[in-house]
C-alpha cells in the first residue's frame, strides 16, 4: 500500500465511525429522559496523560493472550520492538527505540541497556532490556510521544508503563477471598505457562500473592523449529551465518508478586509490595560466525527485584485531598555466560569431529544495578480560581549504582586460568527534583492541563572494582545534568460525543554511564569517552479528535515529534603514511612509509530528527447502527503511518512502516463466549527511508571511504490473519484459544531485520543474504489457556 492511500483509508474509517453515528448519540441524549446514572469512579495515582496513550487493561491482556512484548505490540500501530536476535532492547515508539523509550513498573524506571556497538557485534554480553511477565500485570500504558514529566529521563519518544495486579483482580466479583489458577500453552515457541495466585479484598485489606513460571524453546521461523546440527550439517540446518532455521534454545523464567494494603481508618492507609523475575535462556548458537571449527553456547540470565513501601493520608481538608509517601528499591542483573571452543580434529583422517566439543573459554559477563528512591506527593482538592483547578505536587530523590563485572575462565592443556575484570568504572548516579501539575476545568466546554518538572542529575564514576585491561585507571570527573520538562494541553468538549484537543509534551534522556565514560585503547582504534555530552531532548505536538457514544468510538491523532542533541556513535579516521604503500611493498623497499589507518569511535551529540504521523482507531457497535444485526457484533479498525527525517545522511531506521488493522468481533450478551478476528497489513520498508553509512576500502592498503547506501535487508509487505476467542462453561472457568497467522503466510517484520549486524559473529547473515529465512515470523501457530477462579 502506498502512502498516498492513507487519506482515502482515513476517510473510509472516518465515514464508518464518524459524525452521523455520534451526532445521533448526541441528539438522542438531548431528548431522552434524564434517567442515566453515572457510576462514581475513584482514581488513585493518576497520570497526567496526553491524548496518545493506549491503555491495555487486564481484560485485553487476557482476551488477546498477551504473553510477551511481541504480543503486546501485535495490534498496536506505530509501536515496534528493538529486536537484536538473542536480545530484546525494549520498544520503538515515534521513530526512536531502546533507551530512548522509557519502561517502568509501578512508576519505577527499569535501567538502560549499557552495551555499545563495539561489544554488541561479538555477542558476549546480554544487552537485553528488562521487562515484566504479563501474568503479573493489570494495566499497561503505551505512551506515544515525549513523556518525561511522568517518567523522567528516557521517555524521549514515549514510554511503556506497567501496573501490577491487585487483590481484586484475582477474585470473582462477589468474593472477598479467592484463588486463581491458570495454565497456558503457545505452539510458536512450545512454551508452557503455569500461574497460581491468592487474593483478598474485604474493604480494609487488599492483598495479592502470585507466582508464575514459563518454560519454552526458541520461536519458530515460518514453521521451522531449531535443531542442533548433525555432523557437518546440510540444507538449512548448517552452522554459521547462512543458517536457515533458528538456533535451538530453552528458557525458564520465574515471576512473583506479593502486595498488601491496609486501610487503618477512613483517612490513613499503608502498604507494601514486592515483585520480581528471574530466569535464563540457554541458546546453542549454531549460527555463530567466528570460524567453521568454532562453537558457542550462551546462557542469558536476568534477575529483577522491585520493592515498595507507601503511606497515604486523605485529610478532612478544604484544600488538600491526598498526601502520599513512597520508598522504592530495585535491584537488577543482566548477564551472559558464554561457553566457547573448537571442534577437535582427528589427525588420522584430518576430519573435524563435530560430535565432540572442546571447551576453550567460559565468559561470565554481568551488568548490575541498585536503585533507591523516596517520593512525596501532595494533591489538592478542587480549587476555584477562574475555573476548577486540581493541583498535584511531587518531590523526589534517588540514587542508582551501576557496575560491570566479568569472570572469565580459560582452558588450556587441562588447566584453568581464571580472571576477574571490568570494561569500565562503576558509576553512582544521584537525581533529585520536583514537579507541579494543574488539571483545569474552565467551563462545560473548555479544559486544560499543564505541568512542569525539574531534574538535577549527577553521575560520579567510582574506583575500579576489578582490573580493566583497555581503559583509563583513574576515575573520570563527575558530570552534572540539569533541566526542565513539562506538558501543556487544551481541550474542547464540542458536545456529549465529540472532543478535540491539542497537547505539547517534552522529553529528555541523560546519557548513560557507558555513553559518557566508556574507554577502550587499542592500536587499531580507540573508543574515546566524551564528558561533554548533552542530554537528548524532544517535544511532541499532538492534535486529537475523540468521539464516544453508544454506537462506538473514534480516536484520531496527528502528531509531530522533534528531537535534538541526538547521540550517535561517530567514527573519526586517522591516517598516516603513503597511500598505496603496503607492508609488503615496504618490506621489499618499494616504498618508504607504509600506509596505516585507525578508526576512533566516540559518542557525540550531532543529529536532529523529526517524525510526523497519523493514527486512527475506531470501534463500531453494529447492532446500534443496523437494526437486524444481533447484539454483540462489532467492527474494529486502526491505521498508523509515520514519516521521519534525520539530519545528515542516515535514516531513522526505527520508524515503523505503515500498519493497518481491521477486525470483526462477536461477544455474546451473556458474556459467556466470544470470537474475535484481526487482519493486519504490514507495510514494506522502502529503501529511500533506510539509508545508513559504512566505511569501506577498495582493496588492501587503499584508504577507507565513507559511503551512504541502502540498508541491505528490507521487509516486504504482508497480510496476516488471526482469530481468537473465549468460552465460559461456568462463571469461574474460562477457556481461551487463538490461531495466529491462520493462512500460514511467510513474511519478515522490519523489526527483526533492522537489528542485523553487517559484520558480526552473532545475529548476522552472510554477505549474499543467506540466512534471512532464520528471521521469518512464525507460521500458523496457536495458543490456549485455562483460567479457574474459586
Outline where the language-model segments fall:
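Acidic, small-polar-rich N-terminal luminal/periplasmic segments of exported/outer-membrane proteins
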Residues: 27-170, 289
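Gram-negative outer-membrane beta-barrel transporters
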Residues: 441-444, 448, 457, 559-562, ...
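Transmembrane beta-barrel wall of Gram-negative outer-membrane proteins
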Residues: 187-216, 227-284, 303-306, 378, ...
Amino acid at each position: 500500500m502506498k502512502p498516498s492511500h492513507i487519506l482515502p483509508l482515513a476517510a473510509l474509517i472516518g465515514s464508518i465511525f464518524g459524525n452521523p453515528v455520534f451526532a445521533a448519540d448526541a441528539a438522542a441524549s438531548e431528548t431522552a429522559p434524564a434517567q442515566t446514572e453515572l457510576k462514581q469512579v475513584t482514581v488513585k495515582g493518576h497520570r497526567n496523560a496526553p491524548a496518545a496513550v493506549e491503555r491495555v487493561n487486564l481484560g485485553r491482556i487476557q482476551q488477546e493472550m498477551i504473553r510477551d512484548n511481541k504480543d503486546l505490540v501485535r495490534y498496536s500501530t506505530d509501536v515496534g520492538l528493538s529486536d537484536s536476535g538473542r536480545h530484546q532492547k525494549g520498544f520503538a515508539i515515534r521513530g526512536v527505540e531502546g533507551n530512548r523509550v522509557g519502561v517502568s513498573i509501578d512508576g519505577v524506571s527499569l535501567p538502560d541497556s549499557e552495551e555499545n556497538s563495539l561489544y554488541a557485534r561479538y555477542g558476549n554480553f546480554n544487552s537485553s532490556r528488562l521487562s515484566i511477565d504479563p501474568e503479573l500485570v493489570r494495566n499497561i500504558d503505551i505512551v506515544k510521544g515525549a513523556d518525561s514529566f511522568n517518567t523522567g529521563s528516557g521517555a524521549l519518544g514515549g514510554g511503556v508503563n506497567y501496573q501490577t495486579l491487585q487483590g481484586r483482580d484475582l477474585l470473582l466479583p462477589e468474593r472477598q477471598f479467592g484463588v486463581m489458577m491458570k495454565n497456558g500453552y503457545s505452539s510458536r515457541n512450545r512454551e508452557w505457562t503455569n500461574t497460581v495466585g491468592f487474593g483478598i479484598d474485604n474493604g480494609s485489606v487488599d492483598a495479592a500473592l502470585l507466582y508464575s513460571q514459563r518454560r519454552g524453546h526458541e520461536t519458530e521461523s515460518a514453521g521451522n523449529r531449531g535443531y542442533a546440527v548433525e555432523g557437518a550439517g546440510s540444507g538449512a540446518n548448517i552452522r554459521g551465518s547462512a543458517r536457515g532455521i533458528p538456533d535451538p534454545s530453552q528458557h525458564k523464567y520465574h515471576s512473583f508478586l506479593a502486595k498488601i494494603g491496609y486501610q487503618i481508618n477512613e483517612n490513613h492507609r499503608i502498604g507494601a509490595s514486592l515483585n520480581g523475575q528471574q530466569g535464563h535462556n540457554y541458546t546453542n548458537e549454531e549460527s555463530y560466525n567466528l570460524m567453521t571449527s568454532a562453537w558457542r553456547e550462551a546462557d542469558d540470565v536476568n534477575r529483577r527485584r522491585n520493592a515498595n513501601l507507601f503511606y497515604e493520608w486523605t485529610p478532612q481538608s478544604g484544600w488538600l485531598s491526598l498526601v502520599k509517601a513512597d520508598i522504592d528499591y530495585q535491584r537488577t542483573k543482566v548477564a551472559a555466560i558464554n561457553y566457547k571452543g573448537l571442534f577437535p580434529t582427528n589427525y588420522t583422517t584430518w576430519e573435524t569431529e563435530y560430535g565432540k566439543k572442546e571447551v576453550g573459554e567460559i565468559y561470565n559477563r554481568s551488568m548490575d544495578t541498585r536503585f533507591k528512591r523516596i517520593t512525596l506527593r501532595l494533591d489538592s482538592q478542587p480549587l476555584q480560581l477562574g475555573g476548577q483547578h486540581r493541583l498535584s505536587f511531587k518531590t523526589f530523590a534517588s540514587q542508582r549504582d551501576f557496575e560491570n563485572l566479568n569472570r572469565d575462565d580459560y582452558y588450556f592443556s587441562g588447566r584453568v586460568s581464571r580472571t576477574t575484570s571490568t570494561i569500565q568504572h562503576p558509576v553512582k548516579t544521584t537525581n533529585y527534583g520536583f514537579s507541579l501539575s494543574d488539571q483545569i476545568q474552565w467551563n462545560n466546554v473548555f479544559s486544560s492541563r499543564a505541568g512542569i518538572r525539574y531534574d538535577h542529575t549527577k553521575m560520579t564514576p567510582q574506583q575500579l572494582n576489578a582490573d580493566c585491561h583497555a581503559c583509563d585507571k583513574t576515575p573520570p570527573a563527575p558530570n552534572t545534568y540539569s533541566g526542565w520538562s513539562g506538558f501543556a494541553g487544551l481541550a474542547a468538549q464540542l458536545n456529549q460525543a465529540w472532543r478535540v484537543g491539542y497537547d505539547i509534551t517534552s522529553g529528555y534522556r541523560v546519557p548513560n554511564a557507558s555513553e559518557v565514560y566508556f574507554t577502550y585503547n587499542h592500536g587499531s582504534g580507540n573508543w574515546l569517552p566524551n564528558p561533554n555530552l548533552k542530554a537528548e531532548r524532544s517535544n511532541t505536538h499532538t492534535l486529537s479528535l475523540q468521539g464516544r457514544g453508544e454506537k462506538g468510538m473514534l480516536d484520531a491523532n496527528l502528531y509531530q515529534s522533534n528531537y535534538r542533541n541526538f547521540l550517535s556513535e561517530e567514527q573519526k579516521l586517522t591516517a598516516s603514511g603513503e597511500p598505496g604503500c603496503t607492508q609488503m611493498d615496504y618490506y621489499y623497499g618499494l616504498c618508504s612509509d607504509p600506509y596505516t589507518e585507525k578508526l576512533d569511535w566516540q559518542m557525540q551529540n550531532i543529529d536532529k530528527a523529526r517524525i510526523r504521523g497519523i493514527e486512527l482507531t475506531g470501534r463500531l457497535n453494529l447492532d446500534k447502527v443496523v437494526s437486524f444485526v444481533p447484539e454483540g457484533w462489532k467492527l474494529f479498525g486502526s491505521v498508523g503511518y509515520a514519516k521521519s527525517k534525520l539530519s545528515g545522511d542516515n535514516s531513522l531506521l526505527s520508524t515503523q512502516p505503515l500498519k493497518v488493522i481491521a477486525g470483526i468481533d462477536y461477544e455474546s450478551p451473556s458474556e459467556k463466549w466470544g470470537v474475535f478476528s484481526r487482519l493486519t497489513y504490514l507495510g514494506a520498508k522502502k529503501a529511500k527511508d533506510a539509508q545508513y553509512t559504512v566505511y569501506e576500502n577498495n582493496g588492501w592498503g587503499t584508504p577507507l571511504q565513507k559511503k551512504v547506501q541502502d540498508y541491505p535487508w528490507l521487509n516486504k509487505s504482508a497480510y496476516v490473519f488471526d482469530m481468537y476467542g473465549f468460552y465460559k462453561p461456568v462463571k469461574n472457568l474460562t477457556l481461551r484459544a487463538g490461531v495466529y497467522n491462520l493462512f500460514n503466510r511467510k513474511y519478515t517484520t522490519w523489526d527483526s531485520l533492522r537489528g542485523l549486524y553487517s559484520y558480526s559473529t552473532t545475529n548476522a547473515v552472510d554477505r549474499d543474504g543467506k540466512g534471512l529465512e532464520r528471521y521469518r515470523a512464525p507460521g500458523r501457530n496457536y495458543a490456549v489457556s485455562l483460567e479457574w477462579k474459586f
